[in-house]
Amino acid sequence: MADPLIIKICGIKSLDMLETTIAAGADMVGFMHFPRSPRHVSIEDIATLISTARGRIETCVVLVNPDNSCVAEVAALGPDWIQLHGPESAHRVEAIRAEAGVEIMKALPIGSAEDVSHVAAFADIADRILLDAKPPKGADRPGGLGETFDWALLEGLDPATPFMLS
């Protein structure tokens, strides 16, 4: 049996957006906690959003190369997931997973077959892998920024590796 399709809507910033996402039937919502993102949400607002969402939809807080104090602050809010969307090493992802006590999603930038080969290093460390397009040259923040990558590159991925596409 194939893994179920999971719909995650990221960039939620308000209670209205949260309610619309829940009503639309999404499985998970993401809140960006990265000041350079136009979708950045403060810790205080994330706390309110998580509290409102609890028991209705899974929540995920997106962090970029967080320090330990940021991880602890976010973990204390009780999200279902923390998504790491920066250049975190496998060792750092493992440490954050142990520290946070919540499920960890690791986003990996894909732009070449070599990028796909790095997925295996995170497969047993992160609870879920999210494959995203490599940021365009000159981008000042991570993520595909609305771009896609050549999905034919996924043919080089071990079929036993579960993943999500961004």
Task: Please describe what each predicted stretch is.
Residues 1-166:
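Conserved N-terminal beta1-alpha1 strand-loop-helix module at the mouth
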